[in-house]
Amino acid sequence: MKVTAAFAGLLVTAFAAPAPEPDLVSRSAGINYVQNYNGNLGDFTYDESAGTFSMYWEDGVSSDFVVGLGWTTGSSNAITYSAEYSASGSASYLAVYGWVNYPQAEYYIVEDYGDYNPCSSATSLGTVYSDGSTYQVCTDTRTNEPSITGTSTFTQYFSVRESTRTSGTVTVANHFNFWAHHGFGNSDFNYQVVAVEAWSGAGSASVTISS
């Protein structure tokens, strides 16, 4: 990704995708996946059976974290969530986040964000209208970066909501179908979560996933 000098150092970690961690939890029904990449950088708590999680982080976060709840195998099914999210002064996202195994890809449907819009420095693919708002769509190629298979080269896809929100239903299929015109596999899904990611500043989030 082409980035400005001001963000270059930050984005080394922010867009270095987390590999699976030993403390990821899987269960058999409903929400069955806990994303806990560097959750120790803040106060991460969750109730998997209730579909709720919270994350609080203080100024001085030294690395990237991605935390959330979801499913071991993603899909194009719609996701309904509600959240209280505060990230003013923080490089952070509230997003539907996941991976595709092949062709390997990392994806974000960004519902709200702090001080950094990832499409401000990535390759634009245009816009898609979904769930009451236009989303900016962009892509980037990550070369020899951490991934779900270790270190690899993969594509990132972003849809960034222009009318940001902290609750609603995400029609995931609208984004997958749009990205599919630009190389997104739209099948062979790895995990998928509603996530909070941050790599600077301070903030908080409390999220409930209802579907």
Swiss-Prot record:
The GO biological-process annotations, alphabetized, read as: xylan catabolic process
What this chain does, per the entry, is described as:
Endo-1,4-beta-xylanase involved in the hydrolysis of xylan, a major structural heterogeneous polysaccharide found in plant biomass representing the second most abundant polysaccharide in the biosphere, after cellulose.
The record's active-site residues are 106, 197
Look up the signal peptide feature and give its range. 1-27
Q: Which GO terms describe its molecular function?
A: endo-1,4-beta-xylanase activity
Domain of life, per UniProt, equals: Eukaryota
Question: Which reaction equations make up its catalytic activity?
Answer: Endohydrolysis of (1->4)-beta-D-xylosidic linkages in xylans
What does the record give as its pathway?
Glycan degradation; xylan degradation
Q: Which GO terms describe its cellular component?
A: extracellular region
- What protein name does the entry list? Endo-1,4-beta-xylanase A
| Taxonomic placement | Eukaryota, Fungi, Dikarya, Ascomycota, Pezizomycotina
The entry's localization annotation reads: Secreted
The keyword Secreted belongs to this UniProt entry's keyword annotation: yes
Q: Which residues form the GH11 domain?
A: 28-210
